[in-house]
């Protein structure tokens, strides 16, 4: 499960390392029997699909480039993901693990006991047929039994034990998970903060931050940690994913880039962006930001 290296039969496959999709599977009922479908036999849940306007790196109004090196790519439908996990104390069965073209992680389809269907990000170790559950802040505070600490279960940070690996963490209570959603990412609950109502969490970057105890988080690490090993092998595969060529500034004219112009290949200029900003180590974060008060330790280990 994870990735496979292709045989070097062509230039495009010589260095390619791609997904093997072994984790993709779905449990469906055919007649009186349950059948497990694999790989390309698995189709998404139609009720959770929607068309998504793809800006392709351009503005809606005038079509100006707002994000360079984006555009084209294969057509795709957006899968509606439940990042809030706000369905409290209703058990759900994992029916499928599926591919999602909009993210590096896999997603899994849940069938709740009341008949509702939802997608969530697939955590490592969760299998088809397993049961997951979440609990809201109100139910937890009322003393109702907490779900087990196992991959896929979600609860407020206040009730997650110290040292637990989590993902899909909220920054603002009720807004939905924003942190640790990509393939293989995780964060760690470090314990209670000295500031009342907050919990210390180590971010994927290594930064230690205070997050409100009411924020939801899902237990476990995001699956498909092998994503970092993938090598596309050829430019065409990047185009299928919506990436366009990246032109060097030194290959441009002076009117197009600060590095442009000169007779032949020239060097000696300070690295700059196309808009004249200093790059390669230049700090772009605001010096005084509201959220600075929640950062306990920076990602390089130094206190803020």
Swiss-Prot record:
Q: Which Pfam families does the annotation name?
A: Ribosomal_L2, Ribosomal_L2_C
SMART domains given in the database record? Ribosomal_L2, Ribosomal_L2_C
BP term (GO), one: cytoplasmic translation
Q: Which gene is this protein's source?
A: rplB
What this chain does, per the entry, is described as: One of the primary rRNA binding proteins. Required for association of the 30S and 50S subunits to form the 70S ribosome, for tRNA binding and peptide bond formation. It has been suggested to have peptidyltransferase activity; this is somewhat controversial. Makes several contacts with the 16S rRNA in the 70S ribosome.
| Assembly behavior | Part of the 50S ribosomal subunit. Forms a bridge to the 30S subunit in the 70S ribosome.
Biased composition annotated in UniProt, kind: Basic and acidic residues: 256-272
Molecular function in Gene Ontology? RNA binding; rRNA binding; structural constituent of ribosome; transferase activity
Q: Which domain of life is it from?
A: Bacteria
Region feature Disordered, mapped onto this chain:
246-282
Listed GO cellular component terms? large ribosomal subunit
Q: Which UniProt keywords apply?
A: Ribonucleoprotein, Ribosomal protein, RNA-binding, rRNA-binding
For this protein, the record's PANTHER family field holds: LARGE RIBOSOMAL SUBUNIT PROTEIN UL2M, RIBOSOMAL PROTEIN L2
Q: Which SUPFAM superfamilies match?
A: Nucleic acid-binding proteins (SSF50249), Translation proteins SH3-like domain (SSF50104)
- Protein name (Swiss-Prot/TrEMBL): Large ribosomal subunit protein uL2
Entry's family note: Belongs to the universal ribosomal protein uL2 family.
């Amino acid at each position: 499960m994870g990735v496979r290296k292709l045989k070097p039969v062509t230039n495009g496959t010589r260095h390619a390392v791609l997904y093997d999709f072994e984790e993709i599977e779905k449990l469906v009922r055919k007649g009186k029997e349950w059948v497990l479908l694999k790989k390309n036999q698995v189709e998404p849940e139609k009720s959770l699909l929607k068309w998504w306007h793809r800006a392709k790196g351009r503005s809606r109004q005038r079509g100006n480039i707002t994000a360079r090196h984006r555009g084209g790519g294969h057509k795709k439908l957006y899968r509606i993901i439940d990042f809030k996990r706000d369905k409290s104390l209703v058990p759900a069965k994992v029916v499928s693990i599926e591919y999602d073209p909009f993210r590096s992680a896999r997603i899994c389809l849940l069938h709740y006991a009341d008949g509702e269907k939802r997608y969530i990000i697939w955590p490592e170790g969760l299998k088809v047929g397993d049961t997951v559950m979440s609990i809201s802040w109100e139910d937890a505070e009322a003393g109702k039994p907490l779900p087990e600490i196992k991959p896929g279960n979600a609860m407020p940070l206040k009730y997650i034990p110290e040292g637990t690996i989590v993902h899909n963490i909220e920054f603002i209570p009720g807004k939905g998970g924003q942190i640790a959603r990509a393939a293989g990412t995780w964060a760690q609950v470090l314990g209670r903060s000295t500031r009342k109502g907050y919990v210390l969490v180590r971010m994927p970057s290594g930064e230690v931050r205070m997050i409100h105890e009411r924020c939801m988080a899902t237990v476990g690490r995001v699956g498909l940690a092998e994503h970092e090993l993938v090598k596309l092998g050829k430019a065409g595969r990047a185009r299928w994913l919506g990436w366009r060529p990246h032109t060097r500034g030194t290959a441009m004219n002076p009117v197009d880039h600060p590095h442009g112009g000169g007779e032949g290949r020239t060097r000696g200029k300070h690295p700059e962006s196309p808009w004249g900003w200093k790059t390669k180590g230049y700090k772009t974060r605001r010096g005084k930001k509201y959220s600075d008060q929640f950062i306990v330790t920076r990602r390089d280990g130094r206190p803020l």
